[in-house]
Design a protein with these regions (language model features):
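Left-handed beta-helix
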Residues: 162-314
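Residue-level signal for inorganic ion chemistry
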Residues: 54, 73, 116, 160, ...
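A residue-level structural signature of the nucleotidyltransferase/glycosyltransferase Rossmann-like core
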Residues: 14, 67, 156-157, 228, ...
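Conserved core of the sugar-phosphate nucleotidyltransferase
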Residues: 79-198, 292
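Conserved beta-strand scaffold positions in the cores of enzyme catalytic domains, especially
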Residues: 38, 99-101, 220
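Short beta-strand segments
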Residues: 16, 68-71, 101-105, 133, ...
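Conserved N-terminal catalytic core of the sugar/cofactor nucleotidyltransferase
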Residues: 1-71, 75-87, 293, 313
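Short coil/turn connectors at secondary-structure junctions
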Residues: 10-11, 34-35, 62-65, 95-99, ...
Protein backbone atom coordinates (compact mmCIF):
# COMPACT_ATOMS: atom_id res chain seq x y z
CA UNK A 1 0.00 0.00 0.00
CA UNK A 2 2.73 2.46 0.95
CA UNK A 3 4.56 2.06 -2.36
CA UNK A 4 1.30 2.81 -4.21
CA UNK A 5 0.49 5.89 -2.13
CA UNK A 6 3.32 7.59 -4.00
CA UNK A 7 1.29 7.21 -7.20
CA UNK A 8 -2.36 7.17 -6.10
CA UNK A 9 -4.34 8.55 -3.17
CA UNK A 10 -5.99 6.29 -0.63
CA UNK A 11 -9.35 7.01 -2.29
CA UNK A 12 -8.05 5.18 -5.38
CA UNK A 13 -6.60 2.03 -3.81
CA UNK A 14 -8.53 -1.26 -3.76
CA UNK A 15 -7.47 -4.55 -2.18
CA UNK A 16 -8.87 -7.92 -3.21
CA UNK A 17 -8.34 -10.57 -0.54
CA UNK A 18 -9.84 -13.79 0.75
CA UNK A 19 -12.86 -13.26 3.00
CA UNK A 20 -11.05 -15.00 5.88
CA UNK A 21 -8.35 -12.28 5.76
CA UNK A 22 -10.70 -9.29 5.75
CA UNK A 23 -10.38 -8.39 9.43
CA UNK A 24 -6.59 -8.60 9.33
CA UNK A 25 -6.54 -6.47 6.19
CA UNK A 26 -8.82 -3.85 7.75
CA UNK A 27 -6.53 -3.64 10.76
CA UNK A 28 -3.31 -3.39 8.75
CA UNK A 29 -4.60 -0.76 6.31
CA UNK A 30 -6.67 1.40 8.68
CA UNK A 31 -6.42 5.06 7.67
CA UNK A 32 -4.67 4.21 4.39
CA UNK A 33 -7.37 2.36 2.43
CA UNK A 34 -11.11 2.94 2.51
CA UNK A 35 -12.99 0.17 4.30
CA UNK A 36 -15.37 -0.32 1.37
CA UNK A 37 -12.40 -0.66 -1.01
CA UNK A 38 -11.37 -3.97 0.55
CA UNK A 39 -13.09 -6.55 -1.65
CA UNK A 40 -13.51 -9.96 -0.03
CA UNK A 41 -13.49 -13.09 -2.20
CA UNK A 42 -15.80 -15.81 -0.81
CA UNK A 43 -13.64 -18.41 -2.59
CA UNK A 44 -10.29 -18.51 -4.37
CA UNK A 45 -11.05 -18.55 -8.12
CA UNK A 46 -7.65 -17.49 -9.55
CA UNK A 47 -6.62 -14.10 -10.91
CA UNK A 48 -9.16 -13.67 -13.72
CA UNK A 49 -11.95 -13.72 -11.14
CA UNK A 50 -10.42 -11.31 -8.62
CA UNK A 51 -9.22 -8.85 -11.26
CA UNK A 52 -12.60 -8.95 -12.98
CA UNK A 53 -14.34 -8.37 -9.65
CA UNK A 54 -12.22 -5.28 -9.03
CA UNK A 55 -12.75 -3.98 -12.58
CA UNK A 56 -16.53 -4.31 -12.52
CA UNK A 57 -16.62 -2.69 -9.08
CA UNK A 58 -14.68 0.32 -10.36
CA UNK A 59 -16.78 0.71 -13.52
CA UNK A 60 -20.20 0.19 -11.94
CA UNK A 61 -19.65 2.17 -8.75
CA UNK A 62 -17.20 4.87 -9.77
CA UNK A 63 -17.14 5.14 -13.55
CA UNK A 64 -14.22 4.25 -15.82
CA UNK A 65 -10.59 4.81 -14.91
CA UNK A 66 -7.07 3.48 -15.27
CA UNK A 67 -6.64 0.31 -13.23
CA UNK A 68 -3.22 -0.84 -12.00
CA UNK A 69 -3.02 -4.48 -10.92
CA UNK A 70 -0.10 -4.90 -8.51
CA UNK A 71 0.50 -8.17 -6.60
CA UNK A 72 1.21 -7.64 -2.91
CA UNK A 73 4.07 -10.10 -2.38
CA UNK A 74 7.02 -8.91 -4.54
CA UNK A 75 9.95 -7.16 -2.92
CA UNK A 76 10.85 -3.88 -4.66
CA UNK A 77 14.17 -2.32 -3.71
CA UNK A 78 13.91 1.00 -5.58
CA UNK A 79 10.38 2.22 -4.95
CA UNK A 80 10.87 5.64 -6.57
CA UNK A 81 11.96 3.99 -9.84
CA UNK A 82 9.00 1.60 -9.59
CA UNK A 83 6.62 4.54 -9.17
CA UNK A 84 8.09 6.32 -12.20
CA UNK A 85 7.69 3.14 -14.28
CA UNK A 86 4.09 2.75 -13.13
CA UNK A 87 3.33 6.35 -14.13
CA UNK A 88 4.75 5.67 -17.61
CA UNK A 89 2.55 2.57 -17.86
CA UNK A 90 -0.53 4.57 -16.86
CA UNK A 91 0.28 7.13 -19.55
CA UNK A 92 0.65 4.37 -22.16
CA UNK A 93 -2.71 2.85 -21.19
CA UNK A 94 -4.40 6.26 -21.39
CA UNK A 95 -2.95 7.10 -24.80
CA UNK A 96 -3.28 3.73 -26.55
CA UNK A 97 -6.24 1.94 -24.94
CA UNK A 98 -3.98 -1.14 -24.84
CA UNK A 99 -3.40 -3.72 -22.15
CA UNK A 100 -0.09 -2.74 -20.58
CA UNK A 101 2.21 -4.86 -18.45
CA UNK A 102 5.52 -4.30 -16.68
CA UNK A 103 8.19 -6.84 -17.64
CA UNK A 104 11.18 -7.17 -15.35
CA UNK A 105 14.66 -6.90 -16.84
CA UNK A 106 16.12 -10.36 -16.02
CA UNK A 107 19.29 -10.45 -13.94
CA UNK A 108 19.86 -14.22 -14.16
CA UNK A 109 18.40 -17.18 -16.13
CA UNK A 110 15.46 -17.91 -13.82
CA UNK A 111 13.41 -21.07 -14.32
CA UNK A 112 10.83 -19.91 -11.78
CA UNK A 113 9.22 -17.08 -13.76
CA UNK A 114 7.22 -16.88 -16.95
CA UNK A 115 8.71 -14.66 -19.66
CA UNK A 116 7.47 -12.00 -22.08
CA UNK A 117 8.96 -11.64 -25.57
CA UNK A 118 8.70 -8.13 -27.01
CA UNK A 119 10.00 -5.84 -29.75
CA UNK A 120 10.77 -2.14 -29.79
CA UNK A 121 8.08 0.39 -30.63
CA UNK A 122 10.05 3.09 -32.43
CA UNK A 123 10.22 6.35 -30.54
CA UNK A 124 8.11 5.06 -27.64
CA UNK A 125 9.01 4.26 -24.02
CA UNK A 126 7.14 0.96 -24.23
CA UNK A 127 7.65 -2.22 -26.26
CA UNK A 128 5.12 -4.31 -28.20
CA UNK A 129 4.45 -7.73 -26.71
CA UNK A 130 4.73 -10.63 -29.14
CA UNK A 131 4.37 -13.59 -26.82
CA UNK A 132 3.94 -14.74 -23.22
CA UNK A 133 5.93 -17.93 -22.60
CA UNK A 134 5.85 -20.53 -19.83
CA UNK A 135 8.52 -21.06 -17.19
CA UNK A 136 11.52 -22.45 -19.12
CA UNK A 137 14.12 -25.07 -18.34
CA UNK A 138 17.62 -23.85 -17.47
CA UNK A 139 19.05 -23.98 -21.00
CA UNK A 140 16.07 -22.11 -22.45
CA UNK A 141 16.28 -19.52 -19.67
CA UNK A 142 19.94 -18.92 -20.55
CA UNK A 143 18.98 -18.46 -24.21
CA UNK A 144 16.28 -15.95 -23.22
CA UNK A 145 18.80 -13.96 -21.19
CA UNK A 146 21.28 -13.86 -24.08
CA UNK A 147 18.60 -12.89 -26.63
CA UNK A 148 17.89 -9.62 -24.83
CA UNK A 149 14.24 -9.42 -25.91
CA UNK A 150 12.74 -11.39 -23.02
CA UNK A 151 11.57 -10.05 -19.66
CA UNK A 152 10.21 -11.73 -16.56
CA UNK A 153 6.43 -11.66 -16.23
CA UNK A 154 5.81 -9.61 -13.07
CA UNK A 155 2.03 -10.06 -12.99
CA UNK A 156 1.60 -6.27 -12.97
CA UNK A 157 -0.99 -4.97 -15.42
CA UNK A 158 -2.27 -1.51 -16.29
CA UNK A 159 -5.37 -0.75 -18.38
CA UNK A 160 -8.66 1.08 -18.50
CA UNK A 161 -11.20 -0.82 -16.41
CA UNK A 162 -13.67 -0.69 -19.30
CA UNK A 163 -11.04 -2.02 -21.71
CA UNK A 164 -10.24 -5.11 -19.65
CA UNK A 165 -13.96 -5.82 -19.22
CA UNK A 166 -14.36 -5.72 -23.00
CA UNK A 167 -11.71 -8.46 -23.20
CA UNK A 168 -13.59 -10.51 -20.60
CA UNK A 169 -16.72 -10.22 -22.74
CA UNK A 170 -14.81 -11.35 -25.83
CA UNK A 171 -12.45 -14.00 -24.43
CA UNK A 172 -13.99 -15.12 -21.11
CA UNK A 173 -17.75 -14.81 -21.63
CA UNK A 174 -18.67 -17.18 -18.79
CA UNK A 175 -16.74 -15.06 -16.29
CA UNK A 176 -18.11 -11.87 -17.84
CA UNK A 177 -21.69 -13.11 -17.35
CA UNK A 178 -20.97 -13.79 -13.66
CA UNK A 179 -19.45 -10.33 -13.25
CA UNK A 180 -22.52 -8.71 -14.81
CA UNK A 181 -24.76 -10.64 -12.43
CA UNK A 182 -22.68 -9.36 -9.53
CA UNK A 183 -22.89 -5.81 -10.85
CA UNK A 184 -26.70 -5.97 -10.91
CA UNK A 185 -26.67 -6.47 -7.13
CA UNK A 186 -24.37 -3.55 -6.33
CA UNK A 187 -26.06 -1.05 -4.03
CA UNK A 188 -28.95 -3.39 -3.24
CA UNK A 189 -29.74 -5.38 -0.07
CA UNK A 190 -28.75 -8.53 -2.01
CA UNK A 191 -25.18 -7.44 -2.77
CA UNK A 192 -23.48 -9.59 -0.11
CA UNK A 193 -25.78 -12.57 -0.73
CA UNK A 194 -25.21 -12.38 -4.49
CA UNK A 195 -21.44 -12.26 -4.01
CA UNK A 196 -21.43 -15.47 -1.96
CA UNK A 197 -23.86 -17.14 -4.35
CA UNK A 198 -22.26 -16.17 -7.68
CA UNK A 199 -18.53 -15.78 -7.01
CA UNK A 200 -17.79 -19.46 -6.16
CA UNK A 201 -19.27 -20.40 -9.56
CA UNK A 202 -16.80 -18.28 -11.54
CA UNK A 203 -14.53 -20.53 -13.66
CA UNK A 204 -10.98 -20.80 -12.31
CA UNK A 205 -8.41 -19.44 -14.75
CA UNK A 206 -5.56 -16.96 -14.54
CA UNK A 207 -5.77 -13.63 -16.31
CA UNK A 208 -2.50 -14.57 -18.05
CA UNK A 209 -3.96 -17.67 -19.70
CA UNK A 210 -7.46 -16.31 -20.17
CA UNK A 211 -6.66 -12.88 -21.58
CA UNK A 212 -3.04 -11.71 -21.77
CA UNK A 213 -1.81 -14.61 -23.92
CA UNK A 214 -4.74 -14.15 -26.31
CA UNK A 215 -5.14 -10.36 -26.45
CA UNK A 216 -4.20 -8.58 -29.67
CA UNK A 217 -2.91 -5.25 -28.32
CA UNK A 218 -0.47 -5.63 -25.42
CA UNK A 219 2.37 -3.26 -24.56
CA UNK A 220 5.19 -3.60 -22.05
CA UNK A 221 7.23 -1.18 -19.97
CA UNK A 222 10.57 -2.59 -18.84
CA UNK A 223 11.03 -2.52 -15.08
CA UNK A 224 14.50 -2.31 -13.54
CA UNK A 225 13.84 -1.44 -9.91
CA UNK A 226 15.15 -4.35 -7.86
CA UNK A 227 12.08 -6.59 -8.16
CA UNK A 228 11.95 -10.06 -6.61
CA UNK A 229 8.88 -12.28 -6.36
CA UNK A 230 9.20 -13.41 -2.76
CA UNK A 231 5.99 -15.37 -3.23
CA UNK A 232 8.47 -18.19 -3.94
CA UNK A 233 10.90 -19.23 -1.20
CA UNK A 234 13.76 -19.70 -3.62
CA UNK A 235 13.59 -15.94 -4.28
CA UNK A 236 15.13 -15.32 -0.83
CA UNK A 237 18.48 -15.94 -2.51
CA UNK A 238 18.14 -12.49 -4.06
CA UNK A 239 17.54 -10.87 -0.66
CA UNK A 240 20.14 -12.42 1.64
CA UNK A 241 23.52 -14.11 1.24
CA UNK A 242 24.06 -17.79 2.08
CA UNK A 243 26.65 -18.88 4.65
CA UNK A 244 29.78 -21.00 4.10
CA UNK A 245 27.63 -24.16 3.90
CA UNK A 246 25.30 -22.53 1.38
CA UNK A 247 22.52 -22.33 3.98
CA UNK A 248 20.19 -19.35 4.16
CA UNK A 249 18.52 -18.80 7.55
CA UNK A 250 16.02 -16.32 8.94
CA UNK A 251 14.79 -16.34 12.56
CA UNK A 252 15.47 -19.02 15.17
CA UNK A 253 17.35 -21.79 13.36
CA UNK A 254 20.01 -24.41 14.06
CA UNK A 255 21.40 -26.38 11.12
CA UNK A 256 24.10 -28.98 11.85
CA UNK A 257 26.03 -30.80 9.12
CA UNK A 258 23.53 -29.47 6.61
CA UNK A 259 24.10 -27.87 3.22
CA UNK A 260 22.16 -25.78 0.71
CA UNK A 261 19.08 -25.39 2.90
CA UNK A 262 16.71 -22.46 3.37
CA UNK A 263 15.25 -22.23 6.89
CA UNK A 264 12.75 -19.50 7.77
CA UNK A 265 11.22 -19.27 11.24
CA UNK A 266 8.69 -16.71 12.41
CA UNK A 267 8.55 -17.51 16.13
CA UNK A 268 9.69 -21.09 16.83
CA UNK A 269 13.01 -22.93 16.60
CA UNK A 270 13.81 -24.86 13.43
CA UNK A 271 16.50 -27.49 14.02
CA UNK A 272 17.88 -29.87 11.39
CA UNK A 273 20.84 -32.22 11.18
CA UNK A 274 22.45 -34.00 8.24
CA UNK A 275 20.07 -32.70 5.57
CA UNK A 276 20.63 -30.96 2.27
CA UNK A 277 18.75 -29.10 -0.46
CA UNK A 278 15.65 -28.46 1.67
CA UNK A 279 13.33 -25.52 2.29
CA UNK A 280 11.94 -25.48 5.86
CA UNK A 281 9.47 -22.77 6.83
CA UNK A 282 7.63 -22.22 10.11
CA UNK A 283 4.83 -19.67 10.55
CA UNK A 284 2.26 -19.91 13.34
CA UNK A 285 0.94 -23.47 13.55
CA UNK A 286 2.12 -24.43 10.07
CA UNK A 287 5.40 -25.98 8.92
CA UNK A 288 6.45 -26.41 5.30
CA UNK A 289 9.17 -28.84 4.17
CA UNK A 290 10.08 -29.36 0.53
CA UNK A 291 13.14 -29.92 -1.68
CA UNK A 292 14.72 -26.79 -3.14
CA UNK A 293 13.91 -28.17 -6.59
CA UNK A 294 10.17 -28.22 -5.80
CA UNK A 295 9.93 -24.64 -4.47
CA UNK A 296 7.60 -23.53 -7.26
CA UNK A 297 5.04 -26.17 -6.23
CA UNK A 298 4.27 -24.49 -2.90
CA UNK A 299 1.28 -22.82 -4.55
CA UNK A 300 -0.24 -26.30 -4.95
CA UNK A 301 -0.32 -26.60 -1.16
CA UNK A 302 -1.95 -23.17 -0.90
CA UNK A 303 -4.62 -24.18 -3.41
CA UNK A 304 -5.25 -27.52 -1.68
CA UNK A 305 -5.62 -25.90 1.75
CA UNK A 306 -7.92 -23.24 0.32
CA UNK A 307 -10.14 -25.87 -1.30
CA UNK A 308 -10.37 -27.69 2.06
CA UNK A 309 -11.33 -24.46 3.84
CA UNK A 310 -8.12 -24.47 5.90
CA UNK A 311 -7.51 -20.76 5.33
CA UNK A 312 -6.25 -20.21 8.88
CA UNK A 313 -2.95 -21.81 7.82
CA UNK A 314 -2.43 -19.51 4.83
Amino acid sequence: VDRLLGVAGKEDIFIVTNASQTEVMLSQTAGRVRKDHILAEPAARNTAACIGYAAVTIVKKYGDGIMCVVPSDPYIREEAVFQDTLREAVKAAEETDALVTIGIKPSFPSTGYGYIRSVEAEGKPYRRVEEFVEKPDEETAKAYLEAGCYAWNSGMFIWKASTILSYYKKLLPDIYDCLMQLAESFGTPREEEALWEIYPRIPKISVDYGIMERADHVLMLTGDFGWSDVGGWDAFDTLKDRDENQNLTVGKTLLLDSRNCTAYSVDKLIAAVGVSDLIIVQAGEAVLVCPQSEAQRVKEIVEALSEKGENSYL
